[in-house]
């Protein structure tokens, strides 16, 4: 206090004021503070002070030739005095204006290319439509959103390598461009920016905007795709919102949206196959989204969605540590629990085995249309604070929280038996059984839960069992809040494991995700999704299955042909023929298969009856488990276009039509490709690779006796050589391998050697 009084006294004396305002600062410490180092200590003051001077800018001497000494108004643009301590000219800010108006112009061709993101933004805003402003309370929740429309999805490191390669190609330093997108972008940008005069540093900054996803954790009440986020300040305030429709879409939003659709389709399809994990991986690896491999998008795209995260987990990528239940993302914010198996009885006296979480825990729950804070103890809901867009969304969140709490009154509210199954007809686990049950009808659950009187707390109201708001009473422990609950902000990713049924667990064994959590919502993808996997042929209906099956046979005819003659069983069991079976009438499958297999066997036995077109036509029918019978067919039926259509055993039909002249096959009128008999070889026939383990040595050698047929080769001893008749009557020398280890490469070498041996 003493010091303050003393200061007050000092300040009341005019001399003190004079010293502080009029005299110069000559204390060494202060001078040091403001002059040491290159860093400006008070930039705003420095700027004001500089701009108050007549010549605050220095420029190279060449400026004197490029700018007149005075402008049209007769104001001086530069001073003849040199800048103290350097060889530069002092220049007035008016010179900048003169330069901007009268200075040299350069080509503007590169501007739209370098400042692409800005030009595109202007276009989007120009074509966007702004609707009316509504005044209402905004329930905003913080979500991690993409703030940079129109970017590729490279990691910072990948982008850095691309930028260095494009902007500073001659700089030293190791740059590794590995991913497809890196290489494509680098090539494209190098071409676009040839002879670009814009400062390299600027180009680098702008490239970064184009290549890297930038996310921020922002309060949002509405659309979260980047074209909405760029106008967030125009569309939502604290108590108002303005309707807005973007004037264009950007690829990154389309990729996010299409990725989710592809992932959902793939997870749903994998669930019903014999080995879900293997199928899922096969589909992810063979799918393209907008022309880019799905696995590459998964590696780069940080989108968090249940199906996308299951695909990432299968690929061994890290995912967020939050878990999913009932379509809500749960993140534990405090507390802990141990899991114990317990048997409980439903209201229908059905026994359920559930894993009970023992202990006090707090969670945030975030869904698309509602969010909540949940506090629970062992099988008891202590408090649930919900906020949502409407009554329906709030009810969804309450049901999920009540089931998750594992309370006894919830289990006792079950009426009837629980026997929900997933797509593969397997029973769901007990927690999902309960969830599905109450999602269908939650009346009993809400009625049995119990209600309590409530205190008047700012911003919170009660909700009754019929989901109407109330200020007096509320469902026990449940309150509705005006404020939303923020999404989990951390971008931390954890290592997870996945089992063959696609259940994803963290390292402690907690289930984070399972196929039950994948949304059933169907949407239309913005980018073309190309599923090359036969498992996804069904997605576009029976016609697509038919066309794809025949296309596959034609594309792989070389290998199919060899397997047909040597290893038919392996061929018949190929998964590519699975979807086709659903088109064949159930009652006829086994008979058709037996008939076609017998026909094929006769072709193999009787030389010269090999008929390529007929084999292709009938092959898919041979894939079903056969039934041996004497039945003969002249046509086989497939169910497409809502009725049975016939495929003739010999000759063309509306379903299968081969044009000998053009060598093209049309299936249901759609082109299914051209049948090129071994385009590279021109000679090798069915046996182009002869047999695995029997490599071709070269041209025929008479010393090894007359030519054998392919089928006689199996009698050769290891190391024995023989001449063999292959394809179109050509004879080559072969030898049976002594070891089996290098068998894999045989078929590749064989193809090359046949060429050499025959030419």
Curated annotation (Swiss-Prot):
Subcellular location: Virion; Host nucleus
Site residues, Avian adaptation: 627
InterPro entries on file: Flu_PB2_2nd, Flu_PB2_6th, Flu_PB2_C, Flu_PB2_CAP-bd, Flu_PB2_middle, Flu_PB2_N, INV_PB2, PB2_helical
Keywords linked to the UniProt accession: Cap snatching, Eukaryotic host gene expression shutoff by virus, Eukaryotic host transcription shutoff by virus, Host gene expression shutoff by virus, Host nucleus, Host-virus interaction, Inhibition of host RNA polymerase II by virus, mRNA capping, mRNA processing, Viral transcription, Virion
Record flagged with keyword Lipid biosynthesis: no
One of the Pfam families matching this protein, by short name: Flu_PB2_2nd
Molecular function, one GO term: RNA binding
Motif stretch (Nuclear localization signal): 736-739
GO biological process: 7-methylguanosine mRNA capping; cap snatching; DNA-templated transcription; symbiont-mediated suppression of host gene expression; symbiont-mediated suppression of host mRNA transcription via inhibition of RNA polymerase II activity; viral RNA genome replication
Keyword check for Protein transport: no
Major localisation: virion
GO terms under cellular component: host cell nucleus; virion component
Family from the record: Belongs to the influenza viruses PB2 family.
Function: Plays an essential role in transcription initiation and cap-stealing mechanism, in which cellular capped pre-mRNAs are used to generate primers for viral transcription. Recognizes and binds the 7-methylguanosine-containing cap of the target pre-RNA which is subsequently cleaved after 10-13 nucleotides by the viral protein PA. Plays a role in the initiation of the viral genome replication and modulates the activity of the ribonucleoprotein (RNP) complex.
Xref: HAMAP family: INV_PB2
Subunit structure: Influenza RNA polymerase is composed of three subunits: PB1, PB2 and PA. Interacts (via N-terminus) with PB1 (via C-terminus). Interacts with nucleoprotein NP (via N-terminus).
Descriptive protein name: Polymerase basic protein 2
Organism: Influenza A virus (strain A/Mallard/New York/6750/1978 H2N2)
Gene: PB2
């Amino acid at each position: 206090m003493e010091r303050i009084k003393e200061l007050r006294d000092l300040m009341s004396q005019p001399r003190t004021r004079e010293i502080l305002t009029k005299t110069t600062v000559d204390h060494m410490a202060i001078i040091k503070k403001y002059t040491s180092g290159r860093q400006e200590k008070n930039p705003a003051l420095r700027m004001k002070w500089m701009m108050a001077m007549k010549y605050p800018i220095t420029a190279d001497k060449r400026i004197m030739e490029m700018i007149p000494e005075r402008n049209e108004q007769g104001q001086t643009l530069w001073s003849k005095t040199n800048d103290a301590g350097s060889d530069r000219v002092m220049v007035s800010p008016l010179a900048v204006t003169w330069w901007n108006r009268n200075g040299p112009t350069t080509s503007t061709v590169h501007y739209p290319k370098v400042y692409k993101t800005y030009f595109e933004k202007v276009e989007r805003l120009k074509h966007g439509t702004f609707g009316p402003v509504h005044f209402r309370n905004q329930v905003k929740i913080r979500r991690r959103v993409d703030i940079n429309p129109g970017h590729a999805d490279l990691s910072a490191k990948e982008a850095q390598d691309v930028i260095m390669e494009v902007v500073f190609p001659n700089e030293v330093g190791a740059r590794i461009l590995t991913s497809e997108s890196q290489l494509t972008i680098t090539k494209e940008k190098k071409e676009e920016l040839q002879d670009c005069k814009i400062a390299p540093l600027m180009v680098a900054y702008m490239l970064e905007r184009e290549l890297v996803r930038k996310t921020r954790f922002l309060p949002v009440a509405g659309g979260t795709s980047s074209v909405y986020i760029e106008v967030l300040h125009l569309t939502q305030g604290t108590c108002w919102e303005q309707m807005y429709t973007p004037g264009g879409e950007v690829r990154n939003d389309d990729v996010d949206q299409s990725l989710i659709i592809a992932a959902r389709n793939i997870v749903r399809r994998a669930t019903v196959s014999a080995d879900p994990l293997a199928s899922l991986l096969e589909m992810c690896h063979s799918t393209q989204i907008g022309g880019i491999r799905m696995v590459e998008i998964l590696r780069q795209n940080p989108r968090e969605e249940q199906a996308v995260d299951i695909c990432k987990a299968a690929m061994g990528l890290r995912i967020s540590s939050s878990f999913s239940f009932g379509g809500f993302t749960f993140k534990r914010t405090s507390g802990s629990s141990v899991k114990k198996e317990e048997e409980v009885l439903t209201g229908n006296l059905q026994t359920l085995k559930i894993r009970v979480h023992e202990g006090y825990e707090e969670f945030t729950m975030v869904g698309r249309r509602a969010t909540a804070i949940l506090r629970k103890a062992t099988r008891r809901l202590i408090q649930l604070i919900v906020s949502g867009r409407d009554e329906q969304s709030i009810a969804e969140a309450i049901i999920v929280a009540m089931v998750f709490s594992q309370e006894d009154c919830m289990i006792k509210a079950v009426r009837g038996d629980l026997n929900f199954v997933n797509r593969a007809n397997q029973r769901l686990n007990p927690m999902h059984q309960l969830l599905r049950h109450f999602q269908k009808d939650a009346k009993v659950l809400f009625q049995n839960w119990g209600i309590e009187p409530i205190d008047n707390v700012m911003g919170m109201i009660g909700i009754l069992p019929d989901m109407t708001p109330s200020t007096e009473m509320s469902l026990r422990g449940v309150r509705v809040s005006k404020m939303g609950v923020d999404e989990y902000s951390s971008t931390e990713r954890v290592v997870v494991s996945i089992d063959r049924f696609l259940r994803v667990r963290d390292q402690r064994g907690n289930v984070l995700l399972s196929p039950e959590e994948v949304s059933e919502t169907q949407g239309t993808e913005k980018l073309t999704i190309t599923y090359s996997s036969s498992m996804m042929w069904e997605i576009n209906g029976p016609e697509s299955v038919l066309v794809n099956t025949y296309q596959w046979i034609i594309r792989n005819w070389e290998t199919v042909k060899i397997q047909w003659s040597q290893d038919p069983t392996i061929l018949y069991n190929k998964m590519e023929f699975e979807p086709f079976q659903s088109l064949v009438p159930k009652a006829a499958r086994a008979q058709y298969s037996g008939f076609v297999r017998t026909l094929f066997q006769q072709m193999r036995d009787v030389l010269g009856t090999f008929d390529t077109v007929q084999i292709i036509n009938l092959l898919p029918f041979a894939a079903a488990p056969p039934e041996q019978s004497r039945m003969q067919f002249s046509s086989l039926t497939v169910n497409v276009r809502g009725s049975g259509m016939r495929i003739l055993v010999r000759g063309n039909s509306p379903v299968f039509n081969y044009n000998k002249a053009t060598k093209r096959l049309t299936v249901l009128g759609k082109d299914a490709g051209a049948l090129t008999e071994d385009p590279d070889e021109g000679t090798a026939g069915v046996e182009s690779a002869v047999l695995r383990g029997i490599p071709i040595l070269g041209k025929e050698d008479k010393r090894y006796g007359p030519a054998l047929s392919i089928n006689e080769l199996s009698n050769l001893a290891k190391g024995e050589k023989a001449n063999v008749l292959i394809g179109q009557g050509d004879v080559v020398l072969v030898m049976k391998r002594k070891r089996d280890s290098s068998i894999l490469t045989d078929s590749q070498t064989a193809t090359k050697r046949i060429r050499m041996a025959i030419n």
